[in-house]
Amino acid sequence: MVKLRLKRYGRKQQPTYRIIAIDVKSRRQGRALKEVGFYDPRKDQTHLDVATIITFIQQGAQPTDTVSHILNRAGVFEQIHAMSIHE
């Protein structure tokens, strides 16, 4: 099973995160299947590859709670819902 989760980067007391698709059995800092975004909580900046995220979610990937909150604020779930209505 694949999860969308945060991978920590940055210095002490200055974290930044990459949003990655990774196998459930892998460690947080393990090798990612694909990097799909970036999140900086200090500046509240988010950069997402929305098309890739939607593809992973449609194939069964489960976002963690924090990533789910980030995706919800970016409107990704609304796009998925709109795509499913038009099909």
Curated annotation (Swiss-Prot):
Keywords noted in UniProt: Chloroplast, Plastid, Ribonucleoprotein, Ribosomal protein
Any single GO CC term annotated in Swiss-Prot or TrEMBL for this entry: small ribosomal subunit
Xref: InterPro entries: Ribosomal_bS16, Ribosomal_bS16_CS, Ribosomal_bS16_dom_sf
PROSITE patterns membership: RIBOSOMAL_S16 (PS00732)
GO biological process: mitochondrial translation
Keyword Ribosomal protein: yes
SUPFAM superfamilies reported for this sequence: Ribosomal protein S16 (SSF54565)
GO molecular function: structural constituent of ribosome
Keyword Chloroplast: yes
Subcellular location: Plastid, Chloroplast
Superkingdom of origin: Eukaryota
Family classification: Belongs to the bacterial ribosomal protein bS16 family.
Protein name: Small ribosomal subunit protein bS16c
Species of origin: Zygnema circumcarinatum
